[in-house]
Amino acid sequence: EFNIEIFTQKKNENFKKIITINDDSSKDSLNFLNQSISYLVFLPEMERLFQSSPSYRRNFLDRLIFSSRNDYNRLINKYKKSLIERNKILQSYNFDDDWLNRIESEICLLGLEIYKLRNLQLNTLNIELNNMKNDHNFQFDVKLKIKDDFENTEINFEEYMSNLINSRAYDKQF
């Protein structure tokens, strides 16, 4: 039997989410929880999924992936941190090209993995939608797809890396 508590605690003028398992908030306990339980929360605003922004739809898709793959949020967070680090490096006046190349290489690897998982999730959703259509004799088809440059060009690591390198001057502005 496990006692799981989730609460917030004020720390340095900010609130921090605390999760404990049997009164233990260690990293090992949290790893155990993440490996043991998958969960997915649907909210009322999700009905507007198809009218909302692309980032909202990506976040929804990411939550679906996380429900079956507990390490997915770690992948997303690592990707976002790498993007932030790249931007900081680009905005500094003197930077090490080798370090920037290493960060951009990590961005490529993580980005391609995220893209692959999102495509797999969309394929699963499409299969389920098709099954529902067939089971209930629906008179309409619904097919979800990703509409972006990756889909059209089936981008690989080298192209992704080249795009990052070529966009350094532009990205430096942000």
Please place each PLM-identified region on the residue numbering.
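Generic structural signal of hydrophobic/aromatic residues within well-ordered alpha-helices
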Residues: 33, 37, 53, 86, ...
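Alpha-helix initiation and N-capping motif
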Residues: 30, 54-58, 83, 100, ...
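Long, charged N-terminal accessory/stalk domains
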Residues: 48-50, 56-95, 105
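Context-gated lysine
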Residues: 10-11, 16-17, 27, 78-81, ...
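Conserved NTPase motor "head" modules and their coupling/switch loops across ABC/AAA+ ATPases, GTPases
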Residues: 95-174
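Nucleotide-state sensing region of NTPase/ATPase domains
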Residues: 1-56, 62-68, 72, 130
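Short, cationic motifs built from Arg/Lys/His that form the positively charged side of catalytic pockets
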Residues: 15, 57-58, 86, 107, ...
